[in-house]
């Protein structure tokens, strides 16, 4: 599962997810991509489940790029704890995703295979997604 090696601070405030993604909203590596249509926190477990679904489907051909990283710690209090006594301990890591953000990219496979792999990956995610195709194929150097 993905998580930062070390962070400056152990705990973060929750923040807000307003507006569209300004960075990470264009295809950079592969020929096909999965783009977020809704704002959400995507956990490292969901990212890993999506990655496994895609790699199992495309098998040995092609390459997958994960364009999001879970860098936000989410804290939780123990069950049946009284109010007060500070903030809970970090339990898991999430990636903050805004609409328009590219989540995954695939290259080196046909469009049908990429579309099906992305469809399987989207079932593991808590948001609506969109399949994107590069307008002109990328030249291999």
From Swiss-Prot:
GO MF annotations, alphabetized: rRNA binding; structural constituent of ribosome; tRNA binding
Keyword presence, Lyase: no
Keyword tRNA processing listed: no
BP term (GO), one: translation
Keywords linked to the UniProt accession: Ribonucleoprotein, Ribosomal protein, RNA-binding, rRNA-binding, tRNA-binding
GO cellular component: cytosolic large ribosomal subunit
Entry-linked Gene3D superfamilies: Ribosomal protein L10e/L16 (3.90.1170.10)
Pfam families: Ribosomal_L16 (PF00252)
Function: Binds 23S rRNA and is also seen to make contacts with the A and possibly P site tRNAs.
SUBUNIT field: Part of the 50S ribosomal subunit.
Family indicated by similarity: Belongs to the universal ribosomal protein uL16 family.
Protein name, entry field: Large ribosomal subunit protein uL16
């Amino acid at each position: 599962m993905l998580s930062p090696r070390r962070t400056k601070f152990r705990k973060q405030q929750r923040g807000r997810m307003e507006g569209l993604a300004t960075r990470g909203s264009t295809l950079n590596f592969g020929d096909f991509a999965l783009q977020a249509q809704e704002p959400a926190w995507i956990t490292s477990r969901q990212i890993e489940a999506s990655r496994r679904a895609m790699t199992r489907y495309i098998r040995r051909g092609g390459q997958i790029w994960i364009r999001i990283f879970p860098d936000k710690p989410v804290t939780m209090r123990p069950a049946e704890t009284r109010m007060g006594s500070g903030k809970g301990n970090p339990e898991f890591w999430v990636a903050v995703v805004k609409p328009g953000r590219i989540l995954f990219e695939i290259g080196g496979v046909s469009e049908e295979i990429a579309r099906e792999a992305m469809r399987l990956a989207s079932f593991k995610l808590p948001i609506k997604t969109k399949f994107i195709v590069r307008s002109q194929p990328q030249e291999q150097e």
